[in-house]
A protein has these predicted regions:
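Membrane-embedded, hydrophobic transmembrane alpha-helices
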Residues: 1-116, 355-365
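Membrane-embedded alpha-helical segments of multi-pass membrane proteins
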Residues: 15-19, 82-87, 215, 219, ...
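Membrane-interfacial loop-to-transmembrane alpha-helix junctions, especially the N-terminal start
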Residues: 33-54, 122-123, 237-243, 298-303, ...
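Transmembrane signal-anchor helices characteristic of membrane glycosylation enzymes that use polyprenol
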Residues: 122-149, 248-252, 351-363
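Active-site lumenal/periplasmic loops and adjacent helix-entry segments of GT-C-fold
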Residues: 133-250, 259-269, 274, 278
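Membrane-interface transmembrane helices that cradle and orient dolichyl/undecaprenyl
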Residues: 280-301
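Membrane-interface alpha helices of multi-pass inner-membrane proteins
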Residues: 301-318
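Perimembrane helix-loop-helix junctions
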Residues: 324-349
């Protein structure tokens, strides 16, 4: 039974998002005929893209279900959401095989490995130090539990979705039925934890406290690894050192209960942590991908992914949508100034459309 649960977690937390990321890579390769195999995204970037689209789809499916389903909202959600995720992942894997994208991906990985910073012992040493630091963080996150009052709300909402088959229709403080909690209802991150737990046969609280940190902590570092590839493109030996610095920064950033570093390691399962440690760094990562594109015409898929990210931010927190859209427009203005192209600002604004609709719905509720 335990083996089946672990396999279920691997399926829903690794295979499905990676398959969705493959779909993005396959479509990009198909519609950019002159794309070289070296330009294909890395496997880590595809996994990140899959998670972005997975949370964006959660909002697209979950918000209407939540608004119109007073009873059986949770079961209605996973009956729609789960098949869509599986179809997208199968489509990504199938198209990659049909269009022979896998061969290009493996060729790109071999090419990038030859250009990696690990041709010297210093690179391997700092990589070992980084993995050791992350291992300590994962061990502490799995074996220790920090007290946090927000569990009385967010953790309970996740558990009530499993046990009562409703979405934000019960007050977690007294257990009574209540009108839709408009303040928190659009942020479906606790519901996602309940969804994955239900699909794997795991209690929502165990999923939130023991499993989610093992996924989101490495996922956040994966963003920094992708950022390092861009920022230190010509100084590859500094990439592992940058990751060591980020790991130490997270470990010693607990100067108050409000820092993103504190949320990152002690409240990983909460949407606010996901907003500060995944969504906002991912916005910067996507803009760095756009900034460092040598071709004048930027890949449209990056702008579409940015739009999906601004919607996915709503899964973590209603405020996160506003912050990510503000960051998108602000960096988009700098992007326009750098390249002297108004189109960049217009595309940045266009990527905020779904996020803007989210904010309008929040205000209407």
């Amino acid at each position: 039974m335990l083996v089946l649960k672990v396999l279920g977690m691997i399926w829903w937390l690794l295979v499905i998002p990676f398959g969705i990321g493959l779909l993005v890579a396959a479509l990009t390769k198909k519609f950019r005929k002159n794309q070289e195999f070296q330009e294909l995204p890395s496997m880590g970037a595809m996994l990140l893209g899959g998670y972005i689209l997975m949370f964006a789809l959660l909002e697209l499916v979950g918000i209407p279900v939540m608004l119109f389903s007073v009873y059986h909202g949770f079961s209605n959600l996973y009956k729609i959401y789960a098949p869509l995720l599986i179809l997208l992942a199968i489509a990504g894997i199938g198209l990659s095989v049909h269009w022979q994208i896998f061969q290009d991906i493996m060729a790109a990985q071999r090419f990038k490995y030859k250009e990696s910073p690990f041709d010297r012992w210093e690179g391997w040493f700092f990589l070992f130090v980084f993995l050791l630091l992350v291992g300590v963080q994962l061990y502490m996150a799995f074996t220790r539990a920090s007290f946090d009052g927000d569990d009385a709300y967010y953790g309970v909402q996740s558990l009530m979705a499993q046990q009562t088959d409703t979405l934000y229709r019960i007050n977690p403080n007294n257990g009574r039925s209540t009108p839709l909690d408009a303040r928190h209802a659009l942020a479906l991150f606790p519901i996602w934890e309940a969804f994955v737990g239900t699909m794997c046969g795991v209690h929502a609280t165990i999923m939130a406290h023991s499993v989610v940190p093992l996924v989101l902590i490495p996922l956040s570092y994966l963003i920094y690894a992708e950022i390092a590839k861009i920022v230190f493109a010509d100084r590859k030996a500094l990439r592992p050192l940058f990751l060591v610095f980020m790991a130490l920064w997270q470990m010693f950033g607990n100067v108050s209960i409000y820092t993103t570093e504190t949320f990152f390691l002690t409240r990983t399962w909460q949407g606010k942590s996901f907003a500060g440690n995944f969504v906002l760094p991912a916005v910067l990562w996507l803009f760095l991908c756009l900034f460092y594109q040598e071709k004048k015409e930027k890949p449209l898929v990056l702008w579409l992914l940015l739009g999906a990210l601004n919607l996915a931010a709503g899964a973590s927190s209603s405020l996160a949508v506003l912050l990510s859209c503000m960051l998108t427009v602000g960096v988009g203005f700098l992007f326009m100034w750098k390249e002297r192209r108004v189109q960049n600002l217009l595309l940045a604004g266009g990527s905020c459309v779904l996020g803007g609709l989210y904010v309008l719905l929040y205000l209407a509720l």
